[in-house]
Amino acid sequence: MIARTPRGWSGPSFVATGGGGWGLQAGAQVTDFVIVLNNDAAVQAFSRGGNMTIGVDLSAAAGPVGRTAAGAVMPIAAVYTYSRSKGLFVGVSLEGAVIGTQRQSNFNYYGGPVRADSILSGVTKAPPGAAPLRRALGP
């Protein structure tokens, strides 16, 4: 995850997702996510720890690119999620998902203990390895 700060893009903070659900599903798929935190409150809320959402999901994927339509039970969309799926999958389900910080991955990448809020606010300097990603995102 990466955040836009007043001074440009932050360094990346590593995250993991997990969850469970119930419904009728068949097939297998791999999904890549881009998570957009739309405001400072969303960045701060995520930086403090994992967040849980409960939603209804109707999905279909076939071949190299699929589409997923998901609706979360949230009053305001402070977070947008874009996804790209590969595989063969169809299903309807009620799901819960958790997105959390991978503290050990952040430790390994930054060379020591660092908090997600320090990374995403730009307080922690981005390592040189993050430069290509930050350049690709633009100013």
Language model features: what each stretch is:
Residues 1-139:
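Small-residue-enriched, tightly packed secondary-structure blocks
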